[in-house]
Amino acid sequence: QQMCGRCGGTGQIIKNECKTCHGKKVTK
């Protein structure tokens, strides 16, 4: 699963963006 780049890697990813933590998604 892909993780957010901010907020300690937490948050829901919607439309390639982290909605809950307002960060950018990181692909690993």
UniProtKB/Swiss-Prot annotation:
Primary location class: secreted
Q: Which keywords belong to this entry?
A: Acetylation, Disulfide bond, Secreted
Per the entry, what this protein does is: In vitro, inhibits proliferation of the mice ovarian cancer cells ID8.
Instruction: Summarize tissue expression.
Output: Expressed by the venom gland.
Written domain comment of the UniProt record: The cysteine framework is XIV (C-C-C-C).
Name the UniProt record assigns to this protein: Conotoxin Vi14b
Q: List the disulfide bonds.
A: 4-21, 7-18
How does it get modified after it is made?
Answer: The two N6-acetyllysines at position 15 and 25 have been deduced from the mass difference of 42. They are not common in venom proteins.
Cellular component terms per the entry's GO annotation: extracellular region
Q: Does the keyword Secreted apply?
A: yes
* Subcellular location field: Secreted
Where on the chain is N6-acetyllysine found, per UniProt?
Answer: 15, 25
